[in-house]
Amino acid sequence: MNVFDVIGPVMIGPSSSHTAGAVKLGNVALSILGERCVSADILLSGSFASTYKGHGTDKALLSGIMGLSSDDGRIRTAWDLARERQLDCRFRPGSIPGAHPNTARITLRGETGKTCEVEGASIGGGSIMIHRVDGLAVNFTGQSHTLLIRHQDAPGAIAAVTNLLAENGINIGSFSLTRAKKGGEAVMMMEVDNEPCQELNEKIRLLPGIMELIFIKR
C-alpha cells in the first residue's frame, strides 16, 4: 500500500468506494466493450444496492461507462449527459452470492451490437477488482496496463504470446489463465509494466488460436 491508497484519489465525492471506484468499474467495462455504449444493465449487490442513489453510485458507474474520469465535474449531471448521448441505462438492486459488498455486474451493448458482461467490486480508496468477464473468472485491478486474450486452449498458445511480448520489451507483472474446459475457450490475463503498441497488439491477434485481444489502459 502507498500513501495514495491511504489518502484516496482526486474525485467528485462523496465516497471513494461509491464514486471513484465505481467510475473505474465503468471505465473498465467500456474498455472491454471497445466501442461507444448505447445501453447498460447494471446489477448492484451489497451496499451498492442499498445506498446507490444516496451516494451517487449510479451517476459514478454511468459516468465511467461514458468514459468520464473520477474528477470530472459532469459526474453530478451524468443522467442528463446520458440522455444527450442517447444512452439507455438501467440499475437493478439485487444480490450476487459471495460477492464483495460493493459489487456491480455491468452488461453493456455497443453501437455495433457487440455486448460484454463485467463483474467487479470497488474495494476502497478508489481501487477495484474485476472478477468476471463474460462469465469467465479473472482477477485484475486496472492499476496496470492489462491484456485479456481469448484463445483456444492448446499447447504453445501461451508461449507464443509471452515470447512476442518479451521480444518487444514488454515485462509481465502478473499472469493468470482461466479455461472453460480442456481444449475449449480460455482467457489469459496479463498485467504488464509498459503499454504495448497497437502494432504489437495486432501481431498477437494474428497468432494461431487467438480469438480476441482486449487492452485496458491503466
What are these regions (language model features)?
Residues 1-10, 37-42:
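Short, hydrophobic/aliphatic alpha-helical segments
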Residues 4, 33-35, 81, 95-100, ...:
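Solvent-exposed alpha-helices and their adjacent loops that cap or buttress functional pockets
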Residues 66-116:
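Contiguous domain-boundary segments centered on the initiation and propagation of an alpha-helix
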Residues 30-41, 75, 101:
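Non-transmembrane, aqueous-exposed alpha-helical and coiled segments at domain scale
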Residues 51-59, 101, 185-191:
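Short glycine/threonine-rich loop-to-helix capping motif typified by GTGT followed
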Residues 8-26:
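Conserved phosphate/anionic-ligand binding catalytic regions in large, soluble enzymes, centered on
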Residues 41, 45-84:
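A structural-propensity feature for long, helix-poor, extended segments
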Residues 89-94, 118-218:
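A conserved regulatory-domain signal marking ACT and ACT-like small-molecule sensing domains
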